[in-house]
């Protein structure tokens, strides 16, 4: 386990560098990330390179016993390149070019930009191929940030046509698969299929989904170019990429070309702009632990190995609606939280607050005058406390499908439908019970998991249906959620009623569905108790499945909401609605009991426990102290039974028997 920092020597005078880097070493920092936005400094004009400054910075890092993580600088090409080749810019859906002047405005499919990428990455990696102080590379920076996965330029139009031609035997097959007879949308050839541009009504959902798939494949192909060039120069370097939380960019697609995944964690920002509820005061100070850890578990699950937090919030940040100061202790708390969920490194962004540009109001571990800020002290403390660990061993998987995210986003049927928040309902319920969760793709091998939760497998074909059926037949316990199996992989309704090919497994079909706004009363009964649900309700018609839940309000009253079916040596529960928190807890605890998975009492919001490598972390994201109950045989490596506000304790033992003392 290690701590790192992001550094921008190009922002500071050379006279300061040695002081900065020596102070990093004093703080216990082991890795320094550099160079992601430095293309113009490296190549001030075409073919003229200035490596002296970067050479010196890398040597200083090595001098003080640390390692450099370098980045390919392709997120910010220099002005001279864009002036030479304005065609490298992305275009909005209406054709407006995304202009030079910030970052992430270039097209992944531009042949010119791919050529320029190959040129600068080759020069950089060749330069440092034999440098012992360079440990590895980050490809580019935050693919997809600022809604830039999709581009609608001519290069993308041509590439989209070619992409479709590679995937369909003929345009007639495409017309049949998409159902283009609707509104007379048949195509005569692949070349006539444009990216979906603005239209008076919605674009065809199959076309929209295909363009999402194509766009994500384009990012993956562009990332593959970087990774191949890096490994060609030195196959001992690691290659990673820093994803962002809650993005629709398919991390699973990129994972194959990376040694491990990384992501950028900004808890007080995400809680403001990536969840619908108004943040509590505690969340404004420390974020929501489940929102953050779901991203930890996604980065870990996508590759099946430990991940890095490549940018950890160091203090106040500039980009969310509000810029609250994190609570005292939050920066240390976040480091422990990441490690407990499988991180092998936490890299703080940035070393010093920048004096210029768009991120002047983004804190660093040190202030712009070089004096230490709170983040510096907390990062130093975390560096002293954290230790090496084996990987997280999760017995529960949560299946996350980016393609279902894209498809339901284009046809939500309610302004309140949100794929991520529906996923969070089940994820949060598992985390409140202390359960470690691998977030995996629909293509993942499920047999190693005792229990699997699949909240929204909206697009289901025969292959996925077979995999889920085989999992249950072999003794697995499966929980399916609302909107499961509504569509086929081409985004068409199945010829049979939902859940389509999963009907035999679930033992039920969807007779009707409805969406309801928040002010409508929505209640159901489940196992003799009454619960709330929200937004979505599928009225289930059991065939061989056993009814377990029944709607009690509105037009749905008397219809089945939840069924359970035994299949082979396992079982499946199918919940047709979006459950409230209490119902989600009841569903997951029944699942865990059936699967024999150990879990804790239900912890309150903001207080979480999790186990890694035989140690248990208790993390308090609230402003009130909490007192733990632990077995007599369990000791504390860090902290004690009373965990103060925004503090952590580390127990030398499993989660078994860990709870909260009653008030």
Curated annotation (Swiss-Prot):
This is Beta-galactosidase BgaH. Induction: Highest expression in cells grown on galactose. Glucose or glycerol, alone or in combination with galactose, gives an intermediate level of expression and peptone-containing media gives very low levels of expression. Stable in 3 M NaCl for several days at room temperature, but approximately 18% and 50% of specific activity is lost when samples are stored overnight at 4 and -20 degrees Celsius, respectively. Activity is irreversibly lost within minutes in low salt buffers. Activity low, but detectable in 30% sorbitol in the complete absence of salt and it is stable in 30% sorbitol for at least four months at -20 degrees Celsius, but at room temperature approximately 20% of specific activity is lost after 48 hours. Substrate binds at residues 103, 141, 319, 359-362. Homodimer. When overexpressed, cleaves several different substrates including o-nitrophenyl-beta-D-galactopyranoside (ONPG), chromogen 5-bromo-4-chloro-3-indolyl-beta-D-galactopyranoside (X-Gal) and lactulose, but not lactose. Also has beta-D-fucosidase activity. No beta-L-fucosidase, beta-glucosidase, beta-arabinosidase or beta-xylosidase activity. Belongs to the glycosyl hydrolase 42 family. The keyword Acyltransferase does not apply. InterPro entries: Beta_galactosidase_C (IPR013739), Beta_galactosidase_Trimer (IPR013738), Class_I_gatase-like (IPR029062), Glyco_hydro_42 (IPR003476), Glyco_hydro_42_N (IPR013529), Glyco_hydro_b (IPR013780), Glycoside_hydrolase_SF (IPR017853). It catalyses: Hydrolysis of terminal non-reducing beta-D-galactose residues in beta-D-galactosides. One of its GO terms (biological process) is galactose metabolic process. The active site is at residues 142, 311. It is an enzyme of class 3 (hydrolase). The keyword Coiled coil does not apply. Keywords: Glycosidase, Hydrolase, Metal-binding, Zinc. One of its GO terms (molecular function) is beta-galactosidase activity. Zn(2+) binds at residues 107, 151, 153, 156. Pfam families: Glyco_hydro_42, Glyco_hydro_42C, Glyco_hydro_42M. It comes from the Archaea. Requires 4 M NaCl for maximal activity. Loss of activity if DTT or beta-mercaptoethanol is omitted from buffers. Addition of 5-20 mM EDTA, 1 mM Cu(2+) or 1 mM Zn(2+) results in loss of activity. Its EC number is 3.2.1.23. GO terms for cellular component: beta-galactosidase complex.
């Amino acid at each position: 386990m290690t701590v790192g920092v992001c550094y921008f020597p190009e922002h500071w005078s050379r006279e300061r560098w040695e002081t900065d880097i020596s102070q990093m070493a004093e703080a216990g920092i082991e890795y320094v990330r550099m160079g992601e936005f430095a293309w113009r400094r490296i190549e001030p004009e075409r073919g003229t390179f200035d490596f002296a400054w970067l050479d010196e910075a890398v040597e200083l890092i090595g001098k003080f016993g640390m390692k450099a993580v370098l980045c390919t600088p392709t997120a910010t090409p220099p002005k001279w390149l864009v002036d030479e080749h304005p065609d490298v810019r992305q275009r909005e859906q209406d054709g407006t070019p995304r202009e030079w002047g910030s970052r992430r405005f270039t097209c992944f499919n531009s042949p010119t930009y791919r050529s320029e990428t190959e040129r600068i990455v080759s020069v950089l990696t060749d330069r440092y191929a034999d440098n012992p102080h360079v440990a590895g590379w980050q490809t580019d920076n935050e693919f997809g940030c600022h809604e830039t996965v999709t581009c609608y330029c001519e290069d993308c139009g041509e590439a989209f046509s070619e992409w479709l031609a590679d995937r369909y035997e003929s345009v007639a097959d495409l017309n049949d698969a998409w159902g283009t007879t609707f509104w007379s949308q048949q195509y005569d050839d692949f070349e006539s299929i444009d990216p979906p541009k603005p239209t008076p009504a919605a674009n065809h959902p199959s076309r929209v989904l295909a363009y999402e798939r194509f766009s994500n494949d384009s990012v993956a192909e562009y990332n593959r170019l970087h990774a191949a060039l890096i490994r060609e120069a030195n196959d001992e370097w690691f290659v990673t990429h820093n994803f962002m939380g809650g993005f629709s960019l398919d991390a699973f697609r990129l994972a194959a070309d990376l040694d491990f995944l990384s992501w950028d964690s900004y808890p007080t920002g995400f809680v403001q702009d990536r969840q619908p509820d108004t943040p509590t005061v505690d969340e404004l100070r420390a974020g929501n632990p489940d929102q953050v850890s779901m991203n930890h578990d996604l980065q870990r699950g996508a590759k099946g190995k430990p991940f890095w937090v490549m940018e950890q919030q160091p203090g106040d940040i500039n980009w969310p609606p509000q810029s609250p100061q994190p609570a005292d202790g939050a920066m240390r708390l976040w480091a422990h939280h990441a490690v407990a969920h499988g991180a092998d490194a936490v890299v703080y962004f940035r070393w010093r607050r920048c004096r210029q540009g768009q991120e002047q109001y983004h804190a660093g571990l040190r202030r712009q005058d070089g004096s230490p800020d709170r983040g510096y002290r907390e990062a130093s403390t975390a560096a002293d406390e954290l230790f090496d660990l084996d990987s997280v061993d999760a017995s529960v998987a949560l299946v996350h499908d980016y393609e279902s995210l894209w498809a339901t986003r284009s046809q939500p049927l309610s302004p309140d439908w949100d794929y991520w928040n529906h996923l969070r309902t089940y994820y949060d319920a598992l985390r409140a019970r202390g359960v470690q969760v691998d977030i995996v793709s629909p293509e993942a091998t499920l047999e190693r998991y005792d229990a699997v939760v699949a909240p929204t497998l909206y697009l289901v074909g025969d292959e996925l249906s077979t995999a889920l059926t085989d999992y249950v037949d072999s003794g697995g316990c499966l929980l399916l959620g609302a909107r499961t199996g509504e569509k086929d992989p081409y985004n068409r309704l199945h010829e049979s009623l939902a859940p389509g090919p999963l009907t035999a497994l679930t033992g039920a079909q969807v007779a009707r569905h409805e969406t309801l706004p928040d002010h409508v009363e929505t209640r159901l009964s489940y196992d003799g108790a009454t619960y709330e649900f929200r937004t979505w309700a599928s009225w289930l018609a059991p065939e061989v499945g056993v009814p377990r839940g029944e709607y009690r309000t509105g037009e749905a009253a008397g219809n089945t909401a939840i069924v359970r079916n035994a299949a082979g040596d396992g079982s499946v529960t199918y919940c047709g609605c979006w459950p409230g928190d209490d119902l989600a807890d009841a569903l997951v605890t029944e699942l865990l009991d059936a699967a024999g998975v150990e879990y804790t009492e239900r912890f309150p919001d903001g207080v979480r426990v999790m186990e890694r490598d035989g140690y248990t972390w208790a993390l308090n994201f609230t402003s009130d102290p909490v007192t733990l109950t632990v077995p007599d045989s369990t000791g504390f490596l860090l902290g004690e039974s009373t965990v103060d506000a925004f503090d952590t304790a580390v127990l030398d033992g499993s989660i078994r028997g860990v709870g909260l003392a009653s008030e």
